[in-house]
Amino acid sequence: MNVTEFAEQIVFGKTLEEKLQAPGKLSIDPERHSRAPLSSLATPGRPQDLKFRQGPGSLQTPSDDKLENEQSRGQLLHFLANHELLATELMALVLLKFPDAPREFRQGVLVTLQEEQEHTRMYMRRMKECGVEFGQYPVSGQFWKMIEPMRSPMDFVSQLSLTFEQANLDYLSLIHI
């Protein structure tokens, strides 16, 4: 499997197994791309129970005082696992949208993508310990909607910093050391 085939499996896959499969050794993409770069995609492929929730309003996460309850903790982990899966899908999308980006940039995205896959698997394991299955609660596609229209690698990096990373800082207050 080459890098593009791996990215396609993640973006278009309809199972978590496809999206979270470790690629093993990837071959280099051929010099000539077999298809034009992906220009736009409304939503990534997803299992039915993880398709983005439609409609207005935000998804509720458990309040801080409820996190001593395993089910509530699992619900918060579910919310965060969706962030990690979205990050995985968006990294794969970058590889498909910008096949001519500098090799070092693409390599960095590929490494980060694999880290995001592992983070998703870790959240899923911990959620299961809390009695929650991934797909049990509705999920948001807001980050996909915000970042998918990117027009360049720099656009991606900028938008990622202003959305994902900033949003994750917002959840830092839930962590008590």
Where does each model-flagged region fall?
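Acidic/His metal-coordination segments adjacent to aromatic residues that form catalytic metal sites
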Residues: 57-77, 99-104, 138-164
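Charged/polar, solvent-exposed surface patches and flexible loops
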Residues: 5-12, 18, 93, 111, ...
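Conserved small/polar residues in nucleotide/adenosyl-binding loops
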Residues: 175-177
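Alpha-helical phosphate/pyrophosphate-handling elements in metalloenzyme active cores
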Residues: 172
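Amphipathic alpha-helix face/heptad-repeat signature
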Residues: 80-83, 112, 160-164, 168
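Long, hydrophobic, well-ordered secondary-structure blocks that form the structural core
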Residues: 81-145
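Terminal targeting/low-complexity segments that flank the catalytic cores of oxidoreductases
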Residues: 1-82, 97-101
